[in-house]
Amino acid sequence: PPPPPPPLFFSTPTPATAILSGLVGSEMCIRDRANPWESLENITKHPEYMWPNIDVDHIKWTGGGTWFWHHMYNRHKGKTFNFDHSNKKYDFLYLNKTHRTHREKLYNRLLNKGILENSLYTNWPEKKLPAKYELPWAQDYPQYGMDQDIFEKPYNDTACSIVSETNDNDHEVFMTEKIWKPIIAQQFFVVHGNYLYLQKLKEMGFKTFNNYFEEAYDLDRDPDVRINTIVDVCDRLRDAQWKDMYLRSQSLRQYNFDTFFNKEKLSTEINNTLNLFLEFADSSQVPS
């Protein structure tokens, strides 16, 4: 992959926020190596993503659940979208860009079982969307940096997003723009991501679709078992009564949209992340 952007790095008195102000008088320092647009797994596999190296106790701040929520909130707040879920032509919208082993496994399973026969899907750079479902500049689409844009047409014409997240491990939950786009679009979604991903999403104040279809895949700790369960769910969803499901789920989907664009709720989740700095400092691992 190309060199990552420089990480945020500071070794200073704690930020001048109300939540941290009590530490400043004690001359406490919090040393933070931050790369919040990456997951812990990615920076572990690619240590060059986390630099400069520092030989002191410190926190590795990675994206978790809030970085891309904050990023997408600021990118799309105040915009007017034209989403229309009244006429679905395809079953799934399934977007794969950067090649990753877990993505290849699910992609091949879905393809080989014929589940994607009536779907819009990509597997860059070999398989792309039809031109009419791409933004005008998408034929020269860069490998990195423009994934957060939203084009309504593919969401309007597909019933459900298969969210192809960055990682599928069982020790963190990393949420990217891939989940926030169908939430903004008020579309159904199935997530191929980390163990307990949906549970984390609900802990952050969102709702999922367990009243409409099976979401037991979220409880599958083994990533290969999780893939098997997701394949079964998607296979059954090809026969779903989407028009009825969209009518019955209107309030739920609107709730998620409103929650996403609720600055107070976003701030609460960000403050929960900041509390990790306090817990680290209170553990007396950081020298004063």
Where are the language model's segments positioned?
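Single conserved hydrophobic/aromatic residue that forms the stacking wall/gate
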Residues: P1-G25, I30-D32
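Pol beta-like nucleotidyltransferase catalytic core
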Residues: S26-E27, R31-V163, N169-T176, W180-S288
